[in-house]
């Protein structure tokens, strides 16, 4: 697994697929402005303020979050597609 640095977070997007009558699986055809994801890893160091204090990420592993669409770097690790995002691109934590 990846170990993110600074204000970065590793997530897996929970993309829903649509299935047609013929059984073909298609990715969603219309783009949402946000995407739901599960947090897989967060930075252990956070970012430093101008005074040198460390600000740790406010999300934790396992949480579901909403992320602005298009603000991710997709990578493949151990045959799994994951994305690296900045914590500031997370707009909400999903609660149940």
Curated annotation (Swiss-Prot):
Function: Together with the chaperonin GroEL, plays an essential role in assisting protein folding. The GroEL-GroES system forms a nano-cage that allows encapsulation of the non-native substrate proteins and provides a physical environment optimized to promote and accelerate protein folding. GroES binds to the apical surface of the GroEL ring, thereby capping the opening of the GroEL channel.
Entries under PROSITE patterns matching the protein: CHAPERONINS_CPN10
CDD domains cross-referenced by the UniProt entry: cpn10
Subunit structure: Heptamer of 7 subunits arranged in a ring. Interacts with the chaperonin GroEL.
Designated name of the protein: Co-chaperonin GroES
SMART domains associated with the record: Cpn10
MF (Gene Ontology): ATP binding; metal ion binding; protein folding chaperone; protein-folding chaperone binding; unfolded protein binding
């Amino acid at each position: 697994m990846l170990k993110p640095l600074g204000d970065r977070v590793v997530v897996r997007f929970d993309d829903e697929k649509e299935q047609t009558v013929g059984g073909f699986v298609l990715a969603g055809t219309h783009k949402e402005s946000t995407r739901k994801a599960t947090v897989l890893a967060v930075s252990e160091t956070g970012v430093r303020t101008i005074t040198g204090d460390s600000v740790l990420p406010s999300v934790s592993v396992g949480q579901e979050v909403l992320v602005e669409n298009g603000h991710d770097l997709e990578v493949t690790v151990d045959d799994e597609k994951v994305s690296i995002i900045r914590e500031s691109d997370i707009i909400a934590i999903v609660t149940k």
